[in-house]
Swiss-Prot record:
One BP annotation, GO: L-histidine catabolic process to glutamate and formate
Keywords: Cytoplasm, Histidine metabolism, Hydrolase, Iron, Metal-binding, Zinc
Sites where the protein binds N-formimidoyl-L-glutamate: 156, 330, 332
Catalysed reaction equations from the record: 4-imidazolone-5-propanoate + H2O = N-formimidoyl-L-glutamate
One Gene Ontology cellular component annotation held by this UniProt entry: cytoplasm
Pathway noted in the entry: Amino-acid degradation; L-histidine degradation into L-glutamate; N-formimidoyl-L-glutamate from L-histidine: step 3/3
Biological source species: Geobacillus kaustophilus (strain HTA426)
Name of the gene this protein is made from: hutI
Protein name: Imidazolonepropionase
Signal peptide positions (record): none
Domain of life: Bacteria
Positions with a binding annotation for 4-imidazolone-5-propanoate: 93, 156, 189, 257, 333
Binding site for Fe(3+): 84, 86, 254, 328
Length: 424
């Protein structure tokens, strides 16, 4: 494999020096930008990062053997990282969207046969091959938008058989697609219809059967619970998260999206790596998250699509909570694969600056899925995941919103996207 030399970026956004801990407060604005910067890559790993003239001198005797990509006038960043998606699912729910546009409530949509249970039904009924192909098409779109690592949750199976099916497809995608997938078990996404009259029995099923089997098969690293009134209580969530910890699965939690319900506090209590959504998190919950180093994964695309007020990122950042951004890609509340659009929305609706949004979609996102030692920044020893954006500075990635500026995507030192085409 020839060395790869990415040269002369007008802005090289490195985010170097932040692998040990996520960025917080004013440190989220320190992007480590190198003007006229270059990256030398060997065997899929970053060897050197710095000003172009410095690297040209250092590798002068090897320039002839290297593959060279000239990024003059463009912006190079780490590969973007999406730490909260529901990647593997079947079907579409645009009919619910039109109902919502006409004023239908969540419960009205549920009673009409929609919501999570509609996707659960479609996902259960889909063949493994059909589910793989549909999810692969979505993953291709993530890659085209500059995303090189994705967290993927289960949660549309809601039975042992079908949760395993989702996680096995996520593993197959990880093994066959350039995008790295980090899997999360979300058997506690909702109470399935067959258990609606005995939700505690479903909780027992998750604890006694699903979690041990997922762990035994090595199909997930994380265990997530949707902790909201009418779904799972804090006590039920605590029991499932502690059971996951006992089986080696690190806790995550869908927290305080609809009302202050103690999800942020619970995340700190159980040592969760992240608490996600947080639109209605209490001041005390935010304080405990900051004290415990729990990452707040914010999902502005979801609030945008649901036409509701977004989480207050400024409140979390100023309190010292490390913040990451994610698409929440799912068919009901955030049908998007564009993390750059989410970054724009974070600036427009959450009070974040472009610098903070960039940090939140790279190194802090890597921390939120336990991958900061491998990806999320451009520095020697890390995996060579880079994106070349056809803009002169990183702010324009978000400023020209709704436009895919990702021109070239490099994954593990290989060009996997160029001029709008995926090469696998």
């Amino acid at each position: 494999m020839r060395p790869l030399f990415v040269r002369r970026a007008r802005q090289l956004v490195t985010l170097a020096g932040s692998s040990a801990a996520p960025l917080v407060k004013e440190k989220m604005s320190d992007l480590g930008i190198i003007e006229n910067g270059s990256v030398w890559i060997e065997n899929g790993t970053i060897v050197a990062v710095g000003p172009d003239d410095e690297l040209v001198r250092r590798f002068a005797d090897r320039l002839a053997e290297a593959e060279v990509i000239d990024a003059k006038g463009k912006t190079v960043t780490p590969g973007l990282i999406d730490p909260h998606t529901h990647l593997v699912y079947a079907g579409s729910r645009e009919h619910e969207w039109t109902m919502r546009l006409h004023g239908a409530t969540y419960m009205e949509i549920m009673n009409a046969g929609g919501g999570i249970h509609a996707t659960t039904k479609a996902t259960r009924e889909a063949s493994e091959e059909a589910l793989y192909e549909e999810s692969k098409r979505r993953l291709d779109q993530f890659l085209l938008h500059g995303v090189t690592t994705v967290e993927a949750k289960s949660g549309y199976g809601l039975s042992l058989e079908h949760e395993i099916k989702q996680l096995e497809i996520a593993k197959r995608l990880h093994d066959t697609h350039p995008v790295d997938i980090v899997s999360t078990f979300l058997g506690a996404h909702a109470v399935p219809p067959e258990w609606k009259h005995d939700p505690d029995e479903y909780v027992r099923l998750v604890i006694d059967e699903m979690i041990p089997e997922v762990s035994r098969r090595g199909l997930a690293e994380f265990n997530d619970v949707f902790c909201e009134r009418g779904v799972f209580t804090p006590d039920q969530a605590r029991r499932m998260l502690e059971a996951g910890k006992a089986s080696g699965l690190t806790p995550k939690i869908h927290a305080d999206e609809i009302e202050p319900y103690g999800g942020a506090e619970l995340a700190a209590e159980v040592g969760a790596i992240s608490a996600d959504h947080l639109l209605r998190a209490s001041d005390e919950g935010i304080r405990r998250m900051a004290d415990g180093g729990v990452i707040g994964v914010l999902l502005p695309g979801t609030a945008f699509f649901l036409m509701t007020k977004a989480a207050d990122a400024r409140r979390l950042i100023d309190a010292g909570v490390p913040v990451a951004l994610a698409t929440d890609c799912n068919p009901g509340s955030s049908p998007t694969v564009s993390l750059p659009l989410v970054m724009s929305l974070a600036c427009l609706h959450m009070g974040m600056t472009p610098a903070e949004a960039m940090a939140a979609a790279t190194i802090n996102a890597a921390h939120a899925i336990g991958r900061a030692h491998l990806v999320g920044s451009l520095e020697p020893g890390k995996k060579a995941d880079l994106v070349i954006f056809n803009v002169p500075n990183y702010m324009q990635i978000m400023y020209y919103y709704g436009v895919n500026h990702a021109e070239t995507v490099i994954k593990g030192g290989k060009v996997v996207v160029n001029d709008g085409k995926v090469y696998i």
